[in-house]
Amino acid sequence: EIYHQYIKEKEAYYYNYPDTVQTAKIINSYSDRIYERLPSDKDFLNITLGRYQDEISFRVDLREKGITSDINELYEEARLLKKEYSIIEKEMIFDLKSSQLGLVGNSLFIHEQLKSYICQLAVFQSYRDLQIIAIYDEKQQASFNWMKWLPHCKLQMLNVYGMVYSDRTRDQVLNSI
C-alpha cells in the first residue's frame, strides 16, 4: 500500500513536470498536452528549476508498542521500508506569476537554463496566452536564433517578432507594445 501510494505521487510529479526527454516526446508526438495550461490554472506560468529530495505528501506511521525480540527483524524491515518511502524526489517549482527570476553566471550556462525555462513555458502555455519578448546583445544573436521559431515570440497583434537586439529592433518592437 505504501509502495503504490509512493509510486502514485511520483508519477503525478513526473506527469505535471516532465523532464526534457519526456517533453521532447510530448512535442514529437503532437500530444494533446501541448498548450494544456490555461491562465486560470494554478500551474500557469510555472517552471521547474530542478529537483530536490523532500518528504512524501502522506504519512507513514510505525508503532513501537509491544515489540518483542521475536519480531525484532520484522520491525527492522518495517523501519527500513518507512525510511525508503518517506523521501521522494520532487520538482523545484517556480511561479513566474508571483515572482521574478534573475540568473547570474557564465553566459553559456545561463543560455542553456533560459532555453530550458522558455521551452517549458512554450510547450505548456499557448502562444495566445503567453507572448515572449527577448532582449539581448546583438553579439548573442546566434544563441537566441532558435527562439524565432516559437509562435510565442511573434507578437500576434503587431505581426512582429519579439526579438530585441539592436536599436532598430528595440524601436520596432518596444514602441509597438
Specify the residue positions occupied by each region the protein language model found.
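Accessory regions of macromolecular translocation/handling assemblies
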Residues: E1-I177
